[in-house]
Amino acid sequence: MLLRYFNPIGAHESGLIGEDPKGIPNNLLPYVAQVAVGKLACVGVFGDDYPTPDGTGVRDYIHVVDLARGHVAALDWMGGKVGTGAANTLGTIAGEPADDGTRRGVGIFNLGTGTGSSVLDVVHAFERACGKELPYEVKPRRAGDIAENYAACDKARDELGWIAEYDLDRMCADSWRWQSQN
């Protein structure tokens, strides 16, 4: 089973479980959260000249709870029976069930929302969550960054019966709850 994650963010809605990276965060949302609580001065926005609606990079962000649900759906898809024998047909290599119901081979699924949010979308959603304006500074593009990247989730929907449920505002609200309580 291979699950490809697309930018996990968020925290448990209780505010008890979340992400607290050591040092300066490498990922956008923990960085934005630390700006919101005053640990960091300003969000760096790397490029505002991409061919996207607001000029900033677009990524597919997925709530960590949706990601956990995706794992459960993947386990259910395997039926609790994962074969250990060698696959002998293309179908079993591709993860189709064998006659005995076991699955041999590899199932590959994208876990994301299937839609993209820009860097500024994330900043503004977090502003709504925390109730204040967050300072940001536009900086030059980083080498190798692409304009957009988001998941094609139709296979996960069709075969696992799974779709992401949380939107960006909920992801940011849960992250803010965690960050402000810890």
Predicted regions and their residues:
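Hydrophobic, Gly/Ser/Ala-rich alpha-helical and linker tracts in large acyl-processing enzymes
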Residues: 13-25, 32-35
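Conserved beta-loop-beta element that borders a ligand/cofactor-binding pocket
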Residues: 1-14, 42-46
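C-terminal substrate-binding subdomain of Rossmann-fold SDR/epimerase-dehydratase oxidoreductases
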Residues: 28-182
